[in-house]
Amino acid sequence: MSAAISIALKVWGDLACYTIPEAHVERLSYPVITPSAARGILEAIFWKPQIRYELDRITVLKPIRFTSIRRNEIQGTVTVKGASGVNAWMKDPSGYEPYLVDSAGRDDVQGENRTQRNSVLLRDVAYILEARLIVIKPTPTDPPAKYREMFTRRAAQGQCVRQPCLGIREFAAYFAPPDGTETAADENRDLGIMLYDLDFPTDGPVGARPPECALFAPAKLEHGILDVAAMRRNLYRRA
């Protein structure tokens, strides 16, 4: 039997991109952080196998503004395994061959890696994430309040398991506990069908469990507040 307790976190940053699945090449961001991205931020600050997070509400603190940038990106990725992968390079650095962003005119296997892509991003964002911290099997010596105190302490001290990001790894998220003076932006938007989260199987090793499907739901921003609990009541699956 599980038990839950409420937590809240303020996050902000200069740039953010919560990519709409249909626009993953020329990236186009949702106007608001997705529940799955918000959950990822919470897990980046504090995570243990016996807990999980369930978002209830997201408050948008600043007006929604977009910006567009064009960047040089690469068409391929570096492999981990194999004779030319990262693992082999770690064992024998002499065999390291850099993966070049601009290799125009090269005749080897890398070919022409560079490609220019446009991205429509959010700028100057800030949110308050309200969620339930769920303890899977609480005990008298391991209550939910214990984990909330650990989460709040880590958030106040700027500690994290890994650097949380705002949709893309290079867009770092700053975070702190809310101070109670924040006010929601006066934004009202029909966000359409939004990605809620990915559905992972519950059996097998954690690192070897690809998502079975994606979960989507209708989303609406009312006076700067996204009701994630209402989204959860209208989920549908997409393979």
Where are these regions (language model features)?
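N-terminal, Lys/Arg- and Ser/Thr-rich interaction peptides
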Residues: M1-V25, H223, A229
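Internal, well-folded beta-alpha domain core
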Residues: E73, A83-A239
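A short, structural micro-pattern
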Residues: A3, R52, L121-V125
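Glycine/small-residue-rich interface belts in oligomeric ring/scaffold proteins
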Residues: A23, L28-N72
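Short helix/loop capping segments that flank catalytic or ligand/cofactor-binding pockets
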Residues: T19-I20, I69, T139-P140
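Residue-level detector of short, conserved catalytic/binding motifs and their immediate flanks
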Residues: I7, D56, Y127
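Beta-strand elements of well-folded, non-transmembrane domains
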Residues: V11-L15, K62, L129-K137
